């Protein structure tokens, strides 16, 4: 068999390997919708996950404001609101608030975002550890009101977000790792 024939036999295999590699890098679920910037990022439950989201936006040069304890008036002028869901009793204590105060803060933020027709994105990257009773209060408040949801696979083992998306017609993207947010953000904001 000539070298050329060997090469031709390898081409389908190379194509298959490339396809598999690319498929692993693309999150599963709904097609990634477009969102406008600037973005405002805040937490829904005072977990530190919102700060990680802000850092990934910054590293990809996507204009984003951030305040873990922002009140509703602070989000004005934003085109998209990223609410990072996950309850943390430590975070609530550090912010000097209780669950009810955080729920009230998030409720006012959601009302303001809807009034200003912002694109609301719910993000859950805390995994299984951010799916307890405390987190459930914030997830149940935020997720049904989102235009789009991004969830890390280990935080969706019970398919809560997937089922909610199907029931409420909310697109849901499931990612493997937090860093997979980068490809989602690049698609959302057409960043190369």
Please name every model-derived segment.
Residues 2-14:
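Bacterial N-terminal signal peptides that target proteins for export
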Residues 11-24:
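Bacterial N-terminal signal peptides
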Residues 26-33, 40, 151, 155-192:
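Charged, low-complexity C-terminal accessory regions
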Residues 32-59:
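Short, charged N-terminal beta->alpha structural module
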Residues 57-77:
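A short, well-structured beta->alpha microelement
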Residues 93-116, 165-172:
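A short, gly/pro- and small-residue-rich
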Residues 102-136, 179-192:
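Ser/Thr/Gly-rich flexible loops in soluble cytosolic domains mediating phosphotransfer, phosphorylation
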Residues 131-163:
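Structural recognition of alpha->loop->beta junctions
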């Amino acid at each position: 068999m000539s070298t050329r024939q060997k090469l031709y036999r390898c081409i389908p295999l190379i194509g298959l390997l490339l396809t598999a590699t690319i498929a692993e890098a693309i999150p599963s679920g709904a097609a990634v919708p477009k969102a406008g910037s600037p973005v405002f990022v805040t937490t829904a439950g005072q977990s530190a996950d919102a700060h990680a989201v802000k850092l990934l936006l910054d590293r990809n040069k996507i204009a984003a404001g951030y305040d873990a304890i922002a009140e509703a008036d602070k989000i004005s002028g934003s085109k998209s609101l990223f609410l990072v869901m996950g309850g943390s009793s430590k975070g609530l204590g550090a912010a000097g608030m209780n669950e009810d105060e955080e729920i009230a803060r998030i409720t006012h933020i959601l009302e303001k975002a809807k009034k200003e027709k912002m694109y609301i994105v719910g993000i859950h990257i805390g995994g299984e550890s951010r799916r307890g009773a405390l987190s459930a209060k914030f997830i149940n408040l935020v997720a049904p009101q989102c235009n789009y949801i991004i969830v890390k696979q280990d935080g969706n083992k019970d398919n809560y977000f997937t089922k909610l998306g199907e029931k409420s017609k909310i697109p849901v993207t499931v990612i493997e790792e937090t860093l997979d947010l980068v490809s989602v953000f690049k698609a959302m904001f057409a960043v190369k």
